[in-house]
Amino acid sequence: MLDTINGLPAHPLFIHIVVVLLPLSAIGMIALVVIPPFRGTVQKYFVASGVVISAIGAFIAKESGAALEQTRGVTDEHHAWGNRTFYLAIALTVVSALWLWLDTQPKSKTKLATGIIVVLVSLAAITSTVLAGDSGAKAVWETRASESDVVPTVDSQESGAQ
């Protein structure tokens, strides 16, 4: 179902939802928790929407990655970071929803503790996204780059320099 789009592997297309939106949404949640003047209704809806779409995107990326794995294989490292990113996107959705609800209530220690958890999960989600992307890019491009024996250089005599 999620293996190809128009004959191309779907995974490289879907991961961009996660690579762009998950870190932005995580930063948005950190801003909501840490900067009270940023807590306007519009900001909350935008950030919350981004968090939910990120989690959905992480699921789609995970499933399309599993389909790609069947045909092309994948490194264990990329598989592990991809799974962590998916679970952290789900965790961020849950703790963000809880914190957003608690933000409508009077100040409490629960809200403070949940805010700290939101910040920590956000930082973990950003880190996991970067490491999943890095390991995926290495899996795709390291072998292709090493297969190329030709390294373009400019010879000073050929360029006319004396």
What are these regions (language model features)?
Residues 1-162:
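Polytopic transmembrane helical bundles with strong interfacial aromatic enrichment
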